[in-house]
A protein has these predicted regions:
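Conserved Walker A/P-loop ATP-binding site and its immediately adjacent core
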Residues: 47, 60-89, 96, 122-123, ...
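Glycine-rich, phosphate-binding/catalytic loops in enzymes
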Residues: 53-54, 81-84, 133-137, 214-222, ...
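Post-Walker A helix-loop "phosphate-sensing" segment adjacent to the P-loop in P-loop NTPases
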Residues: 55-61, 268-273
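Walker A/P-loop
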Residues: 32-51
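Residues at the beta-strand->loop junction immediately N-terminal to the Walker
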Residues: 37, 67, 250
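Inter-lobe coupling linker of SF2 helicases/translocases
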Residues: 102-149, 158-161, 165-197, 205, ...
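Pre-Walker A (Motif I) flank of P-loop NTPase domains
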Residues: 31-36, 62, 115, 244-245
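Conserved pre-motif I regulatory segment
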Residues: 2-37
Length: 411
């Protein structure tokens, strides 16, 4: 994508966009679903603002909503007004989506001719989806899960219980949804806001999207049923299915597990996965990932154990082709020309400074190992001790034992 021809009318004349930003803007003008995965410092925010304003100027969109982390709400508004002083921007304040003012704010979104509507991450989930649209979506998800159970009757008990739990969760939402949306202040719902573009900053915050799988013994598949991710999935699918645009921004698209690649594909190219018969994780993993048994240090730091993880991609050219259809990935090394340069690291890599252990730390690690064994054997109540508590205290101990006992001497 070559955006060198873009002139960006209406932008602050003091701003000079870099070549990679113009290229990204041109891609956002051409495609409806894009993950902008540029490294930190490459100007993703300004690129996104310029793309929205250019789409609006060309009549390609009517109204865009930008979802940002709470602490960045005002920063986004200020940068947008700096770049486009004449932009019509509606920015949600701390109380605009409270129960008392939500109806008024939704009315302002729906009836105003806004270029950009900026809402904080915590408030986005308060924008209600209409009963009919939500019921259709939830019933569809329930049917998919039930079909998965039927087609995989040989799955392990743990995996089956997890899927049954998700079904009950969706059924509970179906039962409660009607009464929740009878409030007169929420009569304006997501479908009525007039949005045809949704742009999400720090998109990695929505990676915990539930998917059914038989791989209950594979470590690293943190398959939690995140309400925040599911809400984003519903609204993004509605935007896409109605011809709108969906854009995610993040410097860390994949952080913990290969399964996050599948989640990104569900968000940004679901229709492609449907055509390929890969909407479920297990056939996707069979095609693109390989489970490997590897020795790993135990979470409590008391020894090693063998874990099975999806640690290797296979059929990489085919997967790369699919990802390139929506993912705009860029590293500093690719743009370090002219005035865009990052200082080099000493010896071209981070330096590891080793510190000697202490008797107190070694004793505490041994204690953590005993606690972890008790948790795995089920001899201790989760309310009293659990792996999350053990790993959290282990990190504190590794940093400084005084975080656990302030009476200890300094190292």
């Amino acid at each position: 994508f070559d955006g060198s021809h873009l002139s960006l009318p209406g932008m602050n004349a003091e701003i000079t966009m870099r070549p990679h930003q113009l290229d990204a803007i041109w891609r956002l003008l051409q495609e409806r679903s894009v993950l902008l995965a540029h490294e930190v410092g490459l100007g993703k925010t300004l690129t996104s603002i310029a793309a929205i304003m250019e789409l609006k100027r060309l009549g390609r969109i009517n109204k865009a909503m930008v979802v940002v982390p709470n602490h960045l709400t005002l920063q986004w508004q200020e940068e947008a007004l700096w770049a486009y002083p004449l932009a019509k921007i509606l920015c949600a304040g701390p109380k605009d989506l409270s129960k008392q003012k939500r109806g008024e704010f939704l009315s302002r979104i729906a009836t105003g001719d806004w270029d950009v509507v900026i809402v904080p991450q915590s408030s986005f989930k308060l924008l209600p989806v209409g009963i009919e649209a939500l019921n259709d979506f939830l019933n569809g998800e329930i049917d998919k899960l039930r079909n998965f159970l039927y087609q995989n009757a040989d799955m392990g008990r743990s995996a089956e219980k997890q899927i049954q739990k998700a079904i009950k969760h969706y059924e509970s939402r179906l039962a409660n949804q009607a009464s929740m949306q009878k409030d007169a202040r929420e009569t304006i719902v997501w479908e009525m806001l007039g949005l045809d573009m949704l742009l999400v900053d720090e998109f990695h915050a929505y990676k915990n999207l539930f998917f059914p799988t038989k791989m209950s013994r594979v470590a690293g598949l943190a398959n939690t049923n995140s309400q925040r991710a599911f809400d984003m999935f519903i609204k993004s699918r509605f935007i896409q299915q109605n011809g709108g645009r969906f854009v995610g921004i993040t410097a860390t698209p994949v952080t913990n597990t290969l399964a996050e690649v599948f989640t990104l594909q569900r968000y940004f190219q679901y229709s492609t996965l449907e055509k390929l018969g890969l909407t479920h994780f297990d056939p996707w993993a069979k095609l693109f990932a390989q489970a490997v048994a590897l020795p790993e240090m135990s979470p409590e730091g008391g020894g090693f154990r063998i874990n099975i993880r999806l640690a290797k991609f296979v059929n990489v050219p085919e997967l790369s082709t699919l990802l390139s259809q929506f993912c705009e990935a860029l590293k500093w090394e690719q743009v370090q020309t002219g005035t865009i340069r990052r200082p080099a690291l000493h010896q071209e890599r981070p330096l590891i400074v080793e510190l000697p252990s202490t008797p107190e730390l070694e004793d505490y690690i041994a204690e953590l190992a005993e606690r972890a064994t008790a948790v795995r054997n089920g001899t201790v109540s989760p309310e009293f001790d659990n792996m999350l508590k053990i790993t959290s205290e282990g990190r504190k101990a590794a940093l400084d034992m005084r975080l656990l006992n302030h009476l200890l001497p300094a190292w």
